[in-house]
C-alpha cells in the first residue's frame, strides 16, 4: 500500500467513525425524547453460560435500553443451535441457564419480552 492509499484509508476510517458517533448521538437523544418510538430485537444462542464478554459486549447495553423505556425483545436462538451444530447437547438446560443469566444481568421480564425461537 502506498502512503497516499494509506492516508486515504485512514481518512475514510476516521470519517466513518465520526459519522457513526454523530448518528449514535442523534439516536441517543431521540431515545431520551421518546423511547416508545424504538424497539430492539436481540438475543443469543444457548450454547453455554454467558460470561463477562457477553456482559460488556451487549448485555449491559440491552439492560440500559430496557431501563430507558425501549421496547426490548430478547430471543433465545435455540433453532440456530439445532441447525448449526453436530449435536445439540443438553439444550433445555442451556435455554434455562441462558434465561437465568439474562435475569441476573438485569433483563426484567416485566419490561422486556424473552422468548425461544422454537416457540414462535
Where are the regions a protein language model picked out?
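Internal, well-ordered alpha/beta segment that forms a basic, Gly-enriched binding/recognition surface
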Residues: 115-120
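N-terminal catalytic cores of NTP/NDP-binding nucleotidyl/phosphoryl-transfer enzymes
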Residues: 30-92
Amino acid at each position: 500500500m502506498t502512503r497516499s492509499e494509506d492516508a486515504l484509508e485512514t481518512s475514510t476510517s476516521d470519517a466513518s467513525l465520526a459519522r457513526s458517533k454523530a448518528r449514535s448521538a442523534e439516536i441517543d437523544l431521540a431515545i431520551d425524547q421518546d423511547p416508545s418510538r424504538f424497539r430492539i430485537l436481540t438475543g443469543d444462542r444457548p450454547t453455554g453460560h454467558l460470561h463477562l464478554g457477553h456482559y460488556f459486549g451487549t448485555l449491559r447495553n440491552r439492560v440500559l435500553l430496557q431501563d430507558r423505556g425501549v421496547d426490548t425483545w430478547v430471543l433465545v436462538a435455540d433453532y440456530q443451535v439445532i441447525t448449526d451444530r453436530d449435536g445439540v447437547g443438553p439444550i433445555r438446560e442451556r435455554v434455562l441457564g441462558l434465561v437465568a443469566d439474562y435475569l441476573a444481568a438485569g433483563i426484567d421480564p416485566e419490561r422486556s419480552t424473552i422468548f425461544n425461537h422454537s416457540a414462535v
